[in-house]
């Protein structure tokens, strides 16, 4: 009632009078204090104070934290100190040399080709030379490589080569010239969306691999965030999410906020909730995550996405073409992971892994075209005409798209279900046996094809070195120290799993004869990298690896653990 409202206002009148009295006193004090200054001085001080506030704000509120920038500056200054700096440079130089010496792929018996041949070679001669190069490849056919090659069957290879040949000269940049290729790509996207239970509005693009698929999703959500007025869009992702998200943040001027994992290696949903801010542009889940092969709880994270109206990307690059067939293969997953989950707005899945397409093929999917639109680039003002491309590349190899389509059509649902059944059966067998080997343990509860190992009794990198000496290839992991092995269709062949377990047991037994021995070779290099506080040093040393990929100079090779040369 009006009368009641007036009574309430009168109750506050004494407090308003007190507030007015204090504000008048404050105003008079400031005016009196400023009388000794000239107007130009007041203006100058106001400008300087404003600039100082802006400078402090920009110093503190940057994509990279103040503490991180302080550490970088500190380490940079330390490296410039005469004695300490020289010592660090000596150690860095030694680490670089050790890294080069322990790269078996640099061992070549013949000279590099450094100039074009004066006369072109005939077809037979070119193919013969190529066979020399392919003979350098490791023994992946024996099933000793972690991941890398997901099928490799000769008949499938022949099909993919023929499919590529049909579209060798085609380019999806020119759909008017290659309409058949456009149809192939559209069908790949639609088939993949259907596998992940996308609705009629779902859509996507074919990319060159999982990294590009992730980059495209991040680019889309960055542009969406910028449109909403977010100046520094943030990616909130688990610590285990792929490094491609760091790459996207680096490329696109975003900030990545890493969220801690629980003991079972799943993302801590409550920690993710606390990490959400007004700058959050996207949330991330992995199915599974690369390091430990553990599935993140997509439904729980999706609830956060819906509540805070934030896009959620599910990274299924590694296991995408396993998880969609798990139920029909007799290994149903506990939780949904695809577009059936409200809040999931995009998914990435690599067709060149368990889709058995050739390398250079992946799909990024969206629940609705409104998200994909932000992925596109359109240059409307170029003299060469309107330039529009769906992903990073302009020209793309049509042969890869054709071969991807061929793989999908060749396997069909029944083929993928059978392949999934064989892989998961092998992975579960290995998991159960590894759990019973003393002195090592498995991280989390991997449900798919990746098994990560650790040890409380010895440096786990020694196990990788020992297995490497037996011809096996593991992936080194860090934070915490661990190694993993990724099971593919190659490992389902007869006796591969049995030999794997035999070599693991022998290696662990050998290591436990002297569990405190130091790691050598690549294991020592990875151990040093994890222990180094200055991560810029690690990046500097790691760049040597990339430089070595392009070297055409002979390199002297070192030894693996215990002086055992890695077999060719």
UniProtKB/Swiss-Prot annotation:
Q: In which pathway does it act?
A: Lipid metabolism; sphingolipid metabolism
Q: Which residues carry this modification: N6-(pyridoxal phosphate)lysine?
A: 353
Would you name any one GO CC term? endoplasmic reticulum
The Gene Ontology terms for molecular function here are: pyridoxal phosphate binding; sphinganine-1-phosphate aldolase activity
Q: Which residues lie on this side of the membrane: Lumenal?
A: 1-40
Result of knocking out the encoding gene: Mutant animals have a shortened lifespan. Mutant mice show an increase of sphingoid base phosphates, but also other sphingolipids (including sphingosine, ceramide, and sphingomyelin) in the serum and/or liver, resulting in changes in the levels of serum and liver lipids not directly within the sphingolipid pathway, including phospholipids, triacyglycerol, diacylglycerol, and cholesterol. They are deficient in B and T lymphocytes yet have high blood levels of neutrophils and monocytes along with elevated expression of pro-inflammatory cytokines.
Matches recorded under InterPro entries: GrpII_AminoAcid_Decarb, PyrdxlP-dep_de-COase, PyrdxlP-dep_Trfase, PyrdxlP-dep_Trfase_major, PyrdxlP-dep_Trfase_small
User: How would you describe this protein's topology in the membrane?
Assistant: Single-pass type III membrane protein
Family the entry assigns? Belongs to the group II decarboxylase family. Sphingosine-1-phosphate lyase subfamily.
Q: N6-acetyllysine occurs at which residues?
A: 353
Q: Which reaction does it catalyse?
A: sphinganine 1-phosphate = hexadecanal + phosphoethanolamine; sphing-4-enine 1-phosphate = (2E)-hexadecenal + phosphoethanolamine
From which organism does this entry originate? Answer: Mus musculus
Q: Does the record's keyword annotation contain Zinc? A: no
Q: What does this protein do?
A: Cleaves phosphorylated sphingoid bases (PSBs), such as sphingosine-1-phosphate, into fatty aldehydes and phosphoethanolamine. Elevates stress-induced ceramide production and apoptosis. Required for global lipid homeostasis in liver and cholesterol homeostasis in fibroblasts. Involved in the regulation of pro-inflammatory response and neutrophil trafficking. Modulates neuronal autophagy via phosphoethanolamine production which regulates accumulation of aggregate-prone proteins such as APP. Seems to play a role in establishing neuronal contact sites and axonal maintenance.
Superkingdom of the organism of origin: Eukaryota
- Residues recorded with modification Phosphoserine: 564
Where found, per UniProt? Endoplasmic reticulum membrane
Q: In which tissues is it expressed?
A: Highest levels are found in liver, small intestine and thymus, followed by kidney, lung, heart, spleen and brain (at protein level). Also detected in stomach, testis and skeletal muscle (at protein level).
Transmembrane ranges, per UniProt, are: 41-61
Q: Which UniProt keywords apply?
A: Acetylation, Apoptosis, Endoplasmic reticulum, Lipid metabolism, Lyase, Membrane, Nitration, Phosphoprotein, Pyridoxal phosphate, Signal-anchor, Sphingolipid metabolism, Transmembrane, Transmembrane helix
What Pfam families does its record include?
Pyridoxal_deC (PF00282)
Q: What is this protein called?
A: Sphingosine-1-phosphate lyase 1
- The Enzyme Commission number assigned here is 4.1.2.27
Cytoplasmic topology ranges: 62-568
- What cofactor does this chain's UniProt record say it requires? pyridoxal 5'-phosphate
Q: Which GO terms describe its biological process?
A: androgen metabolic process; apoptotic signaling pathway; ceramide metabolic process; estrogen metabolic process; face morphogenesis; fatty acid metabolic process; female gonad development; fibroblast migration
């Amino acid at each position: 009632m009006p009368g009641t409202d007036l009574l309430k206002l009168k109750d506050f009148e004494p407090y308003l009078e007190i507030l007015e009295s204090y504000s008048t006193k404050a105003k008079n004090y400031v005016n009196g204090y400023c009388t000794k200054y000239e107007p130009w001085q007041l203006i100058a001080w106001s400008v300087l104070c404003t600039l100082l506030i802006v400078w402090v704000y920009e110093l503190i509120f940057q994509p990279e934290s103040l503490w991180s920038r302080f550490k970088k500056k500190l380490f940079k200054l330390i490296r410039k100190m005469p004695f300490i700096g020289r010592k660090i440079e000596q150690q860095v130089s030694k680490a670089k040399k050790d890294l080069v010496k322990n790269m078996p792929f640099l061992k070549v018996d013949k000279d590099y080709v450094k100039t074009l041949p004066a006369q072109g070679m005939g077809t037979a001669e070119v193919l013969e030379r190529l066979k020399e190069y392919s003979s350098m490849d490791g023994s992946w056919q024996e099933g000793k490589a972690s991941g890398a090659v997901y099928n490799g069957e000769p008949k499938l290879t022949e099909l993919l080569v023929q499919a590529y040949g049909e579209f060798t000269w085609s380019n999806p940049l020119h759909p008017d010239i290659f309409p058949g290729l456009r149809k192939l790509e559209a069908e790949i996207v639609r088939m993949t969306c259907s596998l992940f239970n996308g609705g009629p509005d779902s859509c996507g693009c074919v990319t060159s691999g999982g990294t590009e698929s992730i980059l495209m999703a991040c680019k889309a959500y960055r542009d969406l965030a910028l449109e909403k007025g977010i100046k520094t869009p943030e990616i909130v992702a688990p610590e285990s999410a792929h490094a491609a998200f760091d790459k996207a943040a680096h490329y696109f001027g975003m900030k990545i906020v890493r969220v801690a994992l629980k003991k079972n290696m799943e993302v801590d949903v409550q920690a993710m909730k606390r990490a959400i801010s007004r700058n959050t542009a996207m949330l991330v889940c992995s199915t599974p995550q690369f390091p430990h092969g553990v599935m993140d709880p997509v439904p729980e994270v999706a609830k956060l996405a819906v509540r805070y109206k934030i896009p959620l990307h599910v990274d299924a690059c590694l296991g995408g073409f396993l998880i969609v067939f798990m139920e029909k293969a007799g290994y149903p997953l506990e939780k949904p992971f695809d577009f059936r989950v409200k809040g999931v707005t995009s998914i990435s899945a690599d067709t060149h892994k368990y889709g058995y397409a050739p390398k250079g093929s992946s799909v990024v999917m969206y629940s609705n075209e409104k998200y994909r639109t932000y992925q596109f680039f359109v240059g409307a003002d170029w003299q060469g005409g309107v330039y529009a491309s769906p992903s990073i590349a302009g020209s793309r190899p049509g042969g890869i798209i054709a071969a991807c389509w061929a793989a999908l059509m060749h396997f069909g649902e029944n083929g993928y279900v059978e392949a999934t059944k064989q892989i998961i059966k092998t992975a579960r067998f290995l998991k159960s046996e590894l759990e019973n080997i003393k002195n090592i343990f498995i991280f989390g509860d991997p449900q798919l094809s990746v098994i990560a190992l650790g040890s409380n009794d010895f440096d786990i990198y020694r196990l990788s070195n020992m297995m490497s000496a037996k011809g096996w290839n593991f992936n080194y992991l860090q934070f915490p120290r661990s190694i993993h092995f990724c099971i593919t269709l190659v490992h389902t062949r007869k006796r591969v799993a049995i030999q794997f377990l035999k070599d693991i047991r022998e290696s662990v037994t050998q290591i436990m004869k002297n569990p405190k021995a130091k790691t050598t070779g690549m294991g020592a290099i990875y151990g040093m990298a994890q222990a180094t506080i200055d991560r810029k040093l690690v990046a500097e040393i790691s760049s040597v690896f990339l430089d070595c990929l392009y070297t055409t100079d002979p390199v002297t090779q070192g030894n693996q653990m215990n002086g055992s040369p890695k077999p060719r």
